[in-house]
Amino acid sequence: ALPERATRRLTLDVLAGSEWTLVAWDAGEPTPDDPAITLAFRDGRVGGSAGCNRYFASPQPGPSPGELAIGPVGTTRMACPDALAGSESRYLQQLQAVRRFGFLLGRLALSYQHGDGAIGTMLFEERATPP
């Protein structure tokens, strides 16, 4: 049997109240484990940790199921080590380029468009919510 989320229409409602952790960049390229990059959908907004800084943005549904735009993105402005700053910058750029969302083997898939027109996909695992 398919999970309930997989059988519902792809609207932002299926993401409401959910929290996710980035587990793969394009083509399964692993992400940094510590600190985790997170994504939460709450109260009509998205936000989380980009690795060093907190971020927030507005999700905008498209005209067709599964279409999604995120942005503009605002962040806190903490000084970050170079390694974190690079992955954080990459994540925030890709997040603002998101065009579609869906689910792949229980993971949230956010597809975005690179500057050269190629399509990439970030994969997220759902975070357990405390009781």
Question: Whereabouts are the PLM-identified features?
Answer:
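Lipid interaction determinants
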Residues: 1-131
